Amino acid sequence: LHALAESVAFWEREIRKKNLGLVMDGNKFMAATAGSMGVPYRRLTLARFGTYCYWAINDFFDHPGIEKAYNALEDWPDAEIEGSYALAAQKYEIERHARSWWRIAASLPESILRHFYYKVRKMEKGDSVFLSDLVTSPFRIRNAQRHLDRLATAGLEDLAEKTFVYYPLQKEPEATIGQTAPECLSQHAAILAVARDLPAGVLLAIKENISAVGRRTASFYDQIVALKNVVMLHPDTLSLEAVKQAVATITIAGTASMEAAILGKPTLTFSEHIKWKFLPHARVVTCESELPSLLRWAASG
């Protein structure tokens, strides 16, 4: 807490001392301090669609112009989001490739040598990671992948004749949870709430983010698959296809909910700071007591 207070105090002094009229591209502490002092803030932010960016006006990456631009449209052509998804799929394929035995054997010695180089040169990077963690991390991730593969065996073809909502897990830590969604910080709690309140006969299909494998405990997955109305999709399942097949998509503030919204599919989020909440088929869970009715709305299509 002392470090956080010092960071805020530093930026407050800087803004006052230099009489700043605009703050750009700073972290959350800088943005929050500028906002409290009435100083405009701008940050070039990825739009999570193609290679587009926009200027966010606060630490929640908001921009009021998005809704205005949407309302000004006179026609709505079909959205083409496969190209944007292809970039993510390429990244996930690289990460899967990095977990192969031969890739570990090739990269681990290089990582160890680089670590000692940083230590000898007394660089900060040399103290940021313990050697034991560096050595065990690739094997820990492989073990986590094997455990997940034993639990996540369902494919979209298994759900072809079933009604389900789709919940893709988000990587943690991640700005879309820790920074833009202060209302809900626990994906585990969100999943339990959704599974509890889903209408009878509706399944909750969950898919892990490839980038997050090895970051969660084994018990996280064990507790999820123990829920009777939950199925775990195989990590290689194409998320965009799951969005299209599901009756609705649910995240805290993830990109999959935005993709569902673009495609005109019902979507639920747990953050009030999403950029598409003004759409008629996008709803925000502001109170857990309203979740049952929102899920009935979403499941009805």
What spans do the regions from the language model cover?
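Conserved catalytic-core segment of nucleotide-activated headgroup transferases in glycan assembly
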Residues: 113-218
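N-terminal pre-catalytic "stem/leader" segment of glycosyltransferase-like enzymes
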Residues: 1-5, 17, 22-37, 163, ...
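A donor-sugar binding/catalytic signature common to diverse glycosyltransferases
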Residues: 21-27, 31, 41, 45-47, ...
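Active-site-proximal region of nucleotide-activated glycan assembly enzymes
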Residues: 37-141, 297-300
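Extended hydrophobic/aromatic segments used for targeting, binding, or gating
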Residues: 42-79, 173-230
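C-terminal "capping" alpha-helix adjacent to the active site of nucleotide-linked donor transferases
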Residues: 283-301
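Donor nucleotide-activated moiety binding/catalytic core segment of transferases
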Residues: 2-16, 179, 186, 210-256
